[in-house]
From Swiss-Prot:
It comes from the Viruses. It is found in: Virion; Host nucleus. Keywords: Capsid protein, Disulfide bond, Host nucleus, Host-virus interaction, Late protein, Phosphoprotein, T=7 icosahedral capsid protein, Viral attachment to host cell, Viral penetration into host cytoplasm, Virion, Virus endocytosis by host, Virus entry into host cell. The lineage of its organism: Viruses, Monodnaviria, Shotokuvirae, Cossaviricota, Papovaviricetes. Homomultimer; disulfide-linked. The virus capsid is composed of 72 icosahedral units, each one composed of five disulfide-linked copies of VP1. Interacts with minor capsid proteins VP2 and VP3. This is Major capsid protein VP1. It holds the Pfam family Polyoma_coat. InterPro entries: Capsid_VP1_Polyomavir, dsDNA_vir_gr_I_capsid, Polyomavir_VP1_sf. Residues 347-372 are annotated as: Disordered. Residues 307-372 are annotated as: C-terminal arm. Its main location: virion. One of its GO terms (biological process) is endocytosis involved in viral entry into host cell. The modification Phosphothreonine is found at residue 343. The intrinsically disordered C-terminal arm interacts with neighboring pentamers. The unstructured nature of this region allows to make different interactions depending on the structural context: pentamers present at the 12 icosahedral fivefold axes bind five pentamers, whereas pentamers present at the 60 icosahedral six-fold axes interact with six pentamers.
Length: 372
């Protein structure tokens, strides 16, 4: 018998299919002329002096006020206008769903972003009334230099933050969202490393200090963040800028951040270093604004809030709040719960423990051996 001359086409290997992202069931893309949109926005820096004005305060808009160095480790008093903060904003996108009772809904999905720091050329100013490069009255004014921190994020919900400080004895002003503000407890030495209870969401502009809060790598499933840090007291700022660089926001499964509630969340922090006053009379953080151009597309998703759950929530809220003995958790007083469904033949051993786990798999355990 002759062998066939043709070879069968190779079959591609199957890959995991993503069905859940950020608590939302992911379905197909929406096609059509109006299925893609672009959003342009910018975020101004929040370096401490966060509001424009006149006089001394207005002069340092985009800067911090002069940094005060404390005299001891345990007496570290921190003023709100001396710290750089994260900038953030929520952009309300066009509403996609008129009927929220359907099983499937449309959501905006962030696909890519073009972003750059604006105003880098302003750092060429060496003729201002600043600290001289040589002696007191000789040389040019020192340009902005020192520690730099650059970070931006695009997400479908507020950025998740993890708190960590250098000195837990620091006392932050009430206007600052500190670890104590979030947890309601005074900081301890555990806050100088990773404390899983010190978590927050970036929900306020110019209130979360960079020296306390950073993006939480264990969360942010529905956000994308990028950043870099360069330390040092005399480090020159190094920046690149172009309108041709596009950052893709899709993950390995081809899904980007899904904008819950038709909201797009932008976050940024761009610290360029310190501006030093004449004769080193004061040191000020200097920040610059960041520009965003975000491309979004529509995607079908499974309705995460079906009408039945909303009605059940409304029904349960009508009941009075009860404070009784624990029936859930580690101290639960429930001994056994049996749920029956359908019928089956009589089991040979009534003591066999049969159950279905959270993955829907059936398990059978033999009865425990009685104690002697």
């Amino acid at each position: 018998m002759c062998k066939p001359l043709w070879k069968p086409c190779p079959k591609p290997a199957n890959v995991p299919k993503l069905i859940m992202r950020g608590g939302v069931g992911v379905l197909d893309l929406v096609t059509g002329e109006d299925s893609i949109t672009q959003i342009e926005a910018y975020l101004n820096p929040r370096m401490g002096q966060n509001k424009p004005g006149t006089g001394t305060d207005g002069q340092y808009y985009g800067f911090s006020q002069s940094i005060k160095v404390n005299s001891s480790l345990t007496a570290d008093e921190v003023k709100a206008n001396q710290l750089p903060y994260y900038s953030m904003a929520k952009i309300q996108l066009p509403t996609l769903n008129e009927d929220l009772t359907c099983d499937t809904l449309q959501m905006w999905e962030a696909v890519s972003v073009k972003t750059e720091v604006v105003g880098v050329g302003s750092l060429l100013n060496v003729h201002g009334y600043g600290s001289r490069s040589e002696t007191k009255d000789i040389g040019i004014s020192k340009p902005v230099e020192g520690t730099t921190y650059h970070m931006f994020a695009v997400g479908g919900e507020p950025l998740d933050l993890q708190g960590l400080v250098q000195n837990y004895n620091a006392n932050y002003e009430a206007a600052i969202v500190s670890i104590k503000t979030v947890t309601g407890k005074a900081m301890t030495s555990t806050n100088q490393v990773l404390d899983p209870t010190a978590k927050a969401k970036l929900d306020k502009d110019g209130r979360y200090p960079i020296e306390i809060w950073g993006p939480d790598p264990s969360k942010n499933e529905n956000s994308r963040y990028y950043g870099n840090f360069t330390g040092g007291t005399g480090t020159p700022p190094v920046m690149q800028f172009t309108n041709t660089l596009t950052t893709v926001l899709l993950d390995e499964n081809g899904v980007g951040p899904l904008c819950k509630g038709d909201g797009l969340y932008l976050s940024a922090a761009d610290v360029m270093g310190w501006y030093i006053e004449y004769n080193s009379a004061g040191w000020h953080w200097r920040g610059l604004p960041r520009y965003f151009n975000v491309t979004l597309r529509k995607r079908w998703v499974k309705n995460p809030y079906p009408v039945t759950s909303l009605l059940a929530s409304l029904y349960n809220n009508m009941l009075p709040t009860i404070e009784g003995q624990p029936m859930e958790g580690e101290a639960a007083q429930v001994e056994e719960v049996r749920i029956y469904e359908g019928t089956e033949a009589v089991p040979g051993d009534p003591d066999v423990n049969r159950f279905i786990d959270k993955y829907g798999q059936q398990h059978t355990k033999p009865p425990a051996k009685p104690a002697n």
